[in-house]
Amino acid sequence: MRKFDQQQIEQILKKRFFITQSAYIYGGVSGLYDLGPPGLSIKTNILSLWRKHFVLEEDMLEIETTTMLPHDVLKASGHVDKFCDILVFDEVSGDCFRADHLVGDALEKMSPTEEISKELQKVDCMSCQEIDEIISKYNIRSTLGNKLSKSQQFNLMFGTQIGYKGGQTMFLRPETAQGQFLNFKKLCEYNNDKLPFASASIGKAYRNEISPRSGLLRVREFDQAEIEHFVLTDEKDHPKFSTVQGIKLKLMHHDASEEITLKEAIERGIVCNETMGYYIGRTALFLIELGIDRELLRFRQHKKDEMAHYAKGCWDAEIYTSYGWIECVGIADRACYDLSCHEDGSKVDLRCKRRLAEPKEIEEWVLKLDKKEWGAKLRDRFSVLMETVNGLSQKYIEKNVVSIGENRNRLSVKFDEYTINIECSRVKKKVFVENVIPDVIEPSFGIGRILYALIEHSFYLREDSRPVFRFKPAIAPVQCAIGYLIHFDEFNEHILNIKRFLTDNGLVVHVNERSCSIGRKYSSCDELGIPFFITFDPDFLKDRMVTIRERDSMQQIRVDVEKCPSIVLEYIRGQSRWN
């Protein structure tokens, strides 16, 4: 397996301001980082390719939603009760530790046995009781050698209060997905009630890590790019699966680890449906196009005790780095769990219409609100009441309706300061469509992790030990640098023209005016991963020619200054190959 010089890479990242610890002048904050110009530029380019590869290619509906969510939303989604890690305390110093990390590290230091190997495989999924038993069994101590407390659950969400009086409990969102589920009804209407369709969202998510570590891999604030593909349970074939079915990938599944095509994975039932297989294939193509080493990429199927009870299947795209195999993308078939939870929690009907092959007769509740009475009482608020009543789900009505006599039923609804009693009755009718809650297949991308893995995979040392990042031109923080051997005023206008042409075409261009040798200028740009360097030299004054140097081969060509910008643009866009 390839080795990475983690220390040297992280040294360069800090020296060249790819990344720095947040508030470093005050000593920094664990688990929070700021991106400098090159780091942010690479992240922007990753997201640009992600949008092109997924959102534009698949006609996804991209939305932006708030980073703060009310308690009720996250209670319904299960995050208030279940978004937890297990922690333990040093009984002497009071230091706290994430239990699975502490136990895992301790077991790895012990003499390997079959039993310890089995414990390591399930440490991520252990309950508090199982953690306590392992700590006792192997006499695991804190990093200071002290006895550990009993383990306990720790909710990972950041909570706050909003408003002058702090009356409403809010949380920083633990994932971008919830905003998409909350807007499902509007997204469905926007898409003319047609299924399947996919929405997408890019933004910050937050996780109050017990013990952040591994740089960008485990942080308290991170960027996510998430897709929610809404599809009917029995219609998970994908019309474009044939475009990825021949891709061979390393799949670690329940039975074995093997390299097979996605077509074979579907036929053998290893991957549960074509839509899931399609997103696995598209994810692999995206990561490889970014510059991730194909040999250091695998897809691992979640173990049954690792997967949520409602999930029908879950795969992680894992990338090998100096920290080992790290999960960078999760692709899960979440069934109809999320929308069902929010329908129950909000009391709003989140079903969509599905045309039936044959009409059928159904019974449903019909509400009869006294519009005259409540219109007079509520005036401007009456339209809001009507929207609330019309949005009530059949499931909610069925659960809360009360019989008040023979063939008479009543539903009580709280609205503002009123309790409104609404008569309701069961009505039979013939329908040509049915209301269903779709399933969701969710590819979730951890952008910070992908960024770090890409940085490691792009790093190498030349024979003279000079460091280089071999970022692809479309991903590099700066696509082209311009410099000179000796400065002459005659260069200025041409440098400006080249820079303007390239920046007008969406490229990032850096003019290197350092007073140092051209070799040092090249090395400085190699450390940033800049693929092309245009050099003006004294001969330009005679022949109007400049030199283009390519980063990885270090080869140079001389071209006419007027043709130079378009030649560089072709190389960067991949329309011409350097040879």
Swiss-Prot record:
Q: Which InterPro entries match?
A: aa-tRNA-synt_IIb, aa-tRNA-synth_II, aa-tRNA-synth_II/BPL/LPL, Anticodon-bd, Anticodon-bd_dom_sf, Gly-tRNA_synthase/POLG2, GlyRS-like_core, tRNA-synt_gly
EC number(s) of the enzyme? 6.1.1.14, 2.7.7.-
**Which of this chain's residues are annotated to bind glycine?**
175, 226, 442-444
CDD domains listed in its UniProt record: GlyRS-like_core (cd00774), GlyRS_anticodon (cd00858)
> For this protein, what is any one GO molecular function term?
ATP binding
User: In the UniProt record, which is one GO cellular component term?
Assistant: mitochondrion
Ligand binding (ATP): 207-209, 218-219, 327-328, 449
- Which GO terms fall under biological process for this protein? mitochondrial glycyl-tRNA aminoacylation
Q: What does this protein do?
A: Catalyzes the ATP-dependent ligation of glycine to the 3'-end of its cognate tRNA, via the formation of an aminoacyl-adenylate intermediate (Gly-AMP). Also produces diadenosine tetraphosphate (Ap4A), a universal pleiotropic signaling molecule needed for cell regulation pathways, by direct condensation of 2 ATPs. Thereby, may play a special role in Ap4A homeostasis.
Q: Which proteins does it associate with, and in what oligomeric form?
A: Homodimer.
What name does this protein carry? Glycine--tRNA ligase
The taxonomic lineage of its organism, from the top, reads:
Eukaryota, Fungi, Fungi incertae sedis, Microsporidia, Unikaryonidae
